[in-house]
């Protein structure tokens, strides 16, 4: 069977990790990755390759696939929802412009979702919200991410030592991931963190990185943070911090937290969809309300 995996671009994030694991689970099938940024996610490309299953993993790729409403696709279309990004508008002011943008995105997503043969939600929370937001009739299946200890990379030959930092935050730098909340929490208790020599390692790249660097300088905590940049297979670097911090505003079902649980790491995470689903029964985790700087700061002060 020929399975086409559609992404926006090849990256080091959780979406691409999901695709890699999907491909590994189909050793007897012919699999190929198509990138929307290279204009590859079209009906013509799918039909030319003979795709029997078209598995889209990003909205941009799905939009490119269905851009021509008259093109007829020969394959069965699956779309995996890696977090409901419409939630972004829950954190923005209710201005007329934002209300229009939310309506436009919701309308577009409803149109695209209804053209899929199957929609995969990673959590029960997302499945319920997909039905609530996009239509009760949609063919939604819940297929949680999973990770086993046998697949974990050994923490050898890393750039930093094990437990070298008090905290580590690994994520693409964008609004969703909430690094600004973490920087503000560090600033809130900077005297204590400085006295106890508790530094935070940030790993990742992205459009929000420059803003976060500037915010750290503006709040006077540059000496308490280190930015390592983007690192391939960065999950293993959670061992370089004694506690992993995940301050996201929303998530799908993050591989990073699944890996942290598999490694038995201590975790401080925001109580958002995705994080909550992964950590609800994990004893080495504590959670704080989304965007609650004071609560996160208190937990950082008391962390070992």
Per-segment meaning from a language model:
Residues 213-229:
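Nucleotide-activated donor-binding/catalytic signature segment of Leloir-type glycosyltransferases, i.e.
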